[in-house]
Amino acid sequence: MAKKSLKVKQSRPNKFSVRDYTRCLRCGRARAVLSHFGVCRLCFRELAYAGAIPGVKKASW
């Protein structure tokens, strides 16, 4: 889980736009964030298995 200080730091506007980075809206993780859904891969997996994301299901071939 992300530290509280990092979440606060990310919510403030950056001085330079290059410093912007995405964080998971659910847990605050900074890596492996799926921009289309706004959550990290771990939260995406949990939500997909729970059926909370419409149109997403486990692939098998």
UniProtKB/Swiss-Prot annotation:
Zn(2+) binds at C24, C27, C40, C43. This is Small ribosomal subunit protein uS14. Belongs to the universal ribosomal protein uS14 family. Zinc-binding uS14 subfamily. Binds 16S rRNA, required for the assembly of 30S particles and may also be responsible for determining the conformation of the 16S rRNA at the A site. Binds 1 zinc ion per subunit. The lineage of its organism: Bacteria, Bacillati, Mycoplasmatota, Mycoplasmoidales, Mycoplasmoidaceae. SUPFAM superfamilies: Glucocorticoid receptor-like (DNA-binding domain). Keywords: Metal-binding, Ribonucleoprotein, Ribosomal protein, RNA-binding, rRNA-binding, Zinc. Part of the 30S ribosomal subunit. Contacts proteins S3 and S10. It comes from Mycoplasma genitalium (strain ATCC 33530 / DSM 19775 / NCTC 10195 / G37). The keyword RNA-binding applies. It comes from the Bacteria.
